[in-house]
């Protein structure tokens, strides 16, 4: 009988989505098949420090991890490579723990943007999810839109705003119409996203958006249904779930609607779409997955206009795994249980790593 694999569940992080990450991580830890895997819980504080936690108590003791008020039994650790093998090194007692695979559940910056994926590759640790460049491109909404344009995949029109240029409300309205949205290029969970209706509102809300990124997109408002689709698999063979629909009860699907107001949105899973529209959503989700170089998992978000036209809103390379998160729910509606989903995602991580290990890293040998 094969030994159980040690899975490092990594959560928290120096991100505006830190608290959401802890909620996701608890659900993944609960769903992990303990007959196949042994979890190691690694929380990254809001300051960027790494800690190992001995049990699930971390999720009940705190909604966030901060260096000044750590949950009990937090052990400072570092991820490193020793003799070509990835290990967790204790900064407390200098012990070393072997790790077989990482499951990053880090939403937003310093986790979903390719940074930690680069660390995993440096220490030769298999990991769940997209690689460095697809994570970075998926996180940056402007780069995502450029890649989708090359692939001729429709998405909302936009303008790029920076702090160093004149950002004129009237020019934006002339180009995109009114109302329009502004959103930080590198943020998720609707952090810093605002619907703009007046010049006065634009000044205030743009200042808020620039708190989260140095690039902000002004994006046209698309009147239509908000539909999402889960995708998993290797880049050459993606598989899409049945779509689900989000019906916001706020003006749009804001951070508050997602995570604070229990009645912030209605979720219909599967979405009530015609068979033809369902297939079109699944096909475009898979095309987007491939165009963005995704591997492992991604959630693809759509707008559907009243005339049936599909537009990509964005992709999420580490989608939420909270109680209300669409990614696992859409797979459950498609016949894949939460536990089996997690197991398959881990297996995909191992397969991707094995394929990369077969590549040569020396030219003269």
Swiss-Prot record:
Biological process, per Gene Ontology: cell wall organization; peptidoglycan biosynthetic process; regulation of cell shape
EC number: 6.3.2.4
Cofactor note: Binds 2 magnesium or manganese ions per subunit.
GO cellular component: cytosol
Subcellular location: Cytoplasm
UniProt key word Disulfide bond: no
GO molecular function: ATP binding; D-alanine-D-alanine ligase activity; metal ion binding
ATP-grasp domain boundaries: 145-347
Binding site for Mg(2+) 1: 301, 314
Binding residues for ATP: 173-228
Pathway the protein acts in: Cell wall biogenesis; peptidoglycan biosynthesis
Cofactor needs: Mg(2+); Mn(2+)
Keyword set includes Ligase: yes
Gene3D superfamilies: 3.40.50.20, ATP-grasp fold, A domain, ATP-grasp fold, B domain
Catalytic activity: 2 D-alanine + ATP = D-alanyl-D-alanine + ADP + phosphate + H(+)
Top-level division of the source organism's lineage: Bacteria
Keyword field: ATP-binding, Cell shape, Cell wall biogenesis/degradation, Cytoplasm, Ligase, Magnesium, Manganese, Metal-binding, Nucleotide-binding, Peptidoglycan synthesis
Annotated positions binding Mg(2+) 2: 314, 316
PANTHER family, alphabetized: D-ALANINE--D-ALANINE LIGASE (PTHR23132), D-ALANINE--D-ALANINE LIGASE A (PTHR23132:SF25)
Similarity comment: family membership: Belongs to the D-alanine--D-alanine ligase family.
Protein role: Cell wall formation.
The protein's name in its UniProt record: D-alanine--D-alanine ligase
Species assigned in the record: Bdellovibrio bacteriovorus (strain ATCC 15356 / DSM 50701 / NCIMB 9529 / HD100)
């Amino acid at each position: 009988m094969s030994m159980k694999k040690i899975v490092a569940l990594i959560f928290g992080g120096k991100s505006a989505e830190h608290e959401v990450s802890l909620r996701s991580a608890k659900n993944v830890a609960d769903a992990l098949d303990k007959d196949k895997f042994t979890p190691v819980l690694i929380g990254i504080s809001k300051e960027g420090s790494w800690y190992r936690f001995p049990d699930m108590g971390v999720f009940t003791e705190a909604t966030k991890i901060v260096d000044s008020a750590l949950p009990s039994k937090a052990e400072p650790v570092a991820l490193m490579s020793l003799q070509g093998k990835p290990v967790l090194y204790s900064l407390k007692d200098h012990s070393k723990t072997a790790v077989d695979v990482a499951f990053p559940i880090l939403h937003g910056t310093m986790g979903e943007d390719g940074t930690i994926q680069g660390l995993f590759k440096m220490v030769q640790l298999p990991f769940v999810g997209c690689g460095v460049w697809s994570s970075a491109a998926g996180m940056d909404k402007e780069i995502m839109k450029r890649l989708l344009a090359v692939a001729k995949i429709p998405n909302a029109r936009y303008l790029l705003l920076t702090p160093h240029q004149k950002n004129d409300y009237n020019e934006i309205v002339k180009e995109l119409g009114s109302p329009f949205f502004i959103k930080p290029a590198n943020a998720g969970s609707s952090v810093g996203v605002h619907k703009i209706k007046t010049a006065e509102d634009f000044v205030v809300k743009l200042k808020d958006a620039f708190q989260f990124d140095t690039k902000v997109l002004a994006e046209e408002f698309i009147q239509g249904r908000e539909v999402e689709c889960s995708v998993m698999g290797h880049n050459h063979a993606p598989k899409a779930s049945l779509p689900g629909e989000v019906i916001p009860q706020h003006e749009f699907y804001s951070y508050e609607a997602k995570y604070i107001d229990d009645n912030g949105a209605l979720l219909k899973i599967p979405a009530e779409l015609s068979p033809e529209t369902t297939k079109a959503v699944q096909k475009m989700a898979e095309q987007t997955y491939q165009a963005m170089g995704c591997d492992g998992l991604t959630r693809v978000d759509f707008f559907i206009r009243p005339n049936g036209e599909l537009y990509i809103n964005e992709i999420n390379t580490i989608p939420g795994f909270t109680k209300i998160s669409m990614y696992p729910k859409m797979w459950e509606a498609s016949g894949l249980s939460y536990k089996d989903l997690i197991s398959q995602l881990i297996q995909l991580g191992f397969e991707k790593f094995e394929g990369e290990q077969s590549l040569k890293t020396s030219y003269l040998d």
